């Protein structure tokens, strides 16, 4: 019998894992639980091959989404902002101007690509 080892991942962490795997297909490098200068922690930040910065917030439930009051603070720290949710999440609750990623623990798919809002160059340093 094989003994289970390691940490149990939360539902949000499993979504983040699928998102990171998908971003790799775009040649993006991902960091989990990154803290920009604001001091607030983002779930996933993706760094693209041309210097693009994407932030992805992973929401595992409606309650998780509704209790997130910090997400708008992230908009000025990225070129594109996304929500990542599972296939059962009621996507009509999400702001339409944000990007949408449907994810699972193994992969993800970008459903809606948000308009690019180029990050101020002084913030890229």
Feature map (PLM): residue ranges:
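N-terminal short leaders/motifs
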Residues: 1-4, 51-59
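Non-catalytic C-terminal interaction segments of nucleic acid-processing enzymes
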Residues: 1-35, 93-125
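Amphipathic coiled-coil/heptad-repeat helices and related helical stalk/stem segments
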Residues: 15, 40, 66-70
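Flexible, charged surface loops at secondary-structure boundaries
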Residues: 23-25, 48-49, 75-77
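Short, flexible loop segments at the rims of nucleotide/cofactor-binding pockets, characterized by
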Residues: 33-35, 57-64
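Surface-exposed, flexible loop/turn segments at secondary-structure boundaries
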Residues: 38, 52, 89-90, 106-108
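Active-site beta-strand-loop-beta-strand hairpin of nuclease catalytic cores
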Residues: 38, 42-55
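Catalytic cores of nucleic-acid endonucleases
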Residues: 60-104
């Amino acid at each position: 019998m094989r003994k289970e080892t390691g940490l149990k991942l939360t539902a949000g962490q499993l979504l983040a894992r699928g998102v990171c795997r998908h971003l790799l297909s775009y040649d993006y490098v991902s960091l989990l639980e990154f803290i920009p200068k604001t001091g607030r922690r983002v779930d996933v930040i993706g760094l693209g091959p041309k210097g693009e910065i994407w932030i992805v917030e992973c929401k595992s439930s409606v309650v998780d989404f509704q209790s997130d009051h910090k997400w708008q603070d992230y908009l000025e720290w990225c070129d594109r902002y996304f929500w990542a949710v599972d296939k059962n999440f009621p996507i009509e609750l999400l702001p339409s101007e944000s990007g949408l990623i449907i994810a699972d623990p193994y992969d993800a798919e970008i459903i809606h690509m948000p308009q690019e809002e180029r990050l101020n160059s002084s913030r890229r340093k």
